[in-house]
């Protein structure tokens, strides 16, 4: 019988990767089925239009298409990313009572549907340009432009569009992913606009034109409330700079 001997250097590298979390398998190593159900228990309430749509298996299948999602950095960084992602998307799809932060993932479609490319899915993907870029990003080409309702009828595609948005830089905006794992360095223009690392700038990325630079507001507080709840469930600190109350939105340069 032949034995393969692993060198001390290789063992040291593996140990380092283990300590830093680089070998984390996928988002499922943090978000177990049980935790998913606890975080999003309201989603299958009879009052929710999304009842039965957002499943754990669909989330994991989508997450596994993005190897960096929920796997970058140490244990705290990975958990904070999961808390931040679900904090933002729970607000976007909230159907619960104000101030409870338990009603996430109740909706799939935007209630007020002004055009064909209205908000759908966990991130409430809007605008034809985003449907086109998301389709390219998740490997379905023009399918989302031709049939945008796929984001509201195929749960894996729905989650994929949300994670694609989360992982992707757009225009002058960093990716939400890079912000939450501490890999974003503000430019001089960002600094002048009070855009600083933290959960608040993620709100700015997603909906800054309507929620940032105008002082405290209900929507921004909802996003923070969900994030705090999930950080508590994952036993990680929220970090600083949770709001974007004094930040210029990215559209202002």
From Swiss-Prot:
Induction (free text): By fungal infection.
Protein location: Secreted, Extracellular space
SUPFAM superfamilies named among the record's database cross-references: Lysozyme-like
GO CC terms: extracellular region
PROSITE patterns registered for this protein in UniProt: CHITINASE_19_1, CHITINASE_19_2
Family annotation (InterPro entries): Glyco_hydro_19 (IPR016283), Glyco_hydro_19_cat (IPR000726), Lysozyme-like_dom_sf (IPR023346)
EC number: 3.2.1.14
Signal peptide residue numbers: 1-24
One annotated GO molecular function: chitinase activity
Protein name: Acidic 26 kDa endochitinase
Catalytic activity reported: Random endo-hydrolysis of N-acetyl-beta-D-glucosaminide (1->4)-beta-linkages in chitin and chitodextrins
Coiled coil residues, start to end: none
Protein function: Defense against chitin-containing fungal pathogens.
This protein's UniProt keywords: Carbohydrate metabolism, Chitin degradation, Disulfide bond, Glycosidase, Hydrolase, Pathogenesis-related protein, Plant defense, Polysaccharide degradation, Secreted, Signal
Disulphide-bridged cysteine pairs: 212-244
Family listed: Belongs to the glycosyl hydrolase 19 family. Chitinase class II subfamily.
CDD domains per UniProt: chitinase_GH19
GO biological process, one term: polysaccharide catabolic process
List of catalytic residues: 92
């Amino acid at each position: 019988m032949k034995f393969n001997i692993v060198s001390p250097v290789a063992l040291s590298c593996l140990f380092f990767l283990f300590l830093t979390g680089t070998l984390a398998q996928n988002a499922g190593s943090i978000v177990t089925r049980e935790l998913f159900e606890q975080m999003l228990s309201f989603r299958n309430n009879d009052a929710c239009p999304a009842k039965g749509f957002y499943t754990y298996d669909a989330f994991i299948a989508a997450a596994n298409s993005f190897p960096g999602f929920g796997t970058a950095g140490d244990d705290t960084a990975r958990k904070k990313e999961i808390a931040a992602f679900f904090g933002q998307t729970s607000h976007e799809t909230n159907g619960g009572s104000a101030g409870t932060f338990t009603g996430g993932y109740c909706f799939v479609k935007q209630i007020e549907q002004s055009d064909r490319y209205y908000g759908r899915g966990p991130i409430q993907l809007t605008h034809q340009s985003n449907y086109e870029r998301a389709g390219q990003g998740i490997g379905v080409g023009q399918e989302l432009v031709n049939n945008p309702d796929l984001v509201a009828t195929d749960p894996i595609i729905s989650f994929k569009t949300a994670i694609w948005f989360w992982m992707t830089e757009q225009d002058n905006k960093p990716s939400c992913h890079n912000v939450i794992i501490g890999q974003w360095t503000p430019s001089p223009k960002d600094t002048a606009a009070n855009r600083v690392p933290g959960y608040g700038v993620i709100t700015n990325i997603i909906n800054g034109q309507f929620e940032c630079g105008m002082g405290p507001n209900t929507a921004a507080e909802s996003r923070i409330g969900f994030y705090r709840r999930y950080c508590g469930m994952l036993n990680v600190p929220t970090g600083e700079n949770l709001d974007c109350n004094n930040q210029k939105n990215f559209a202002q340069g």
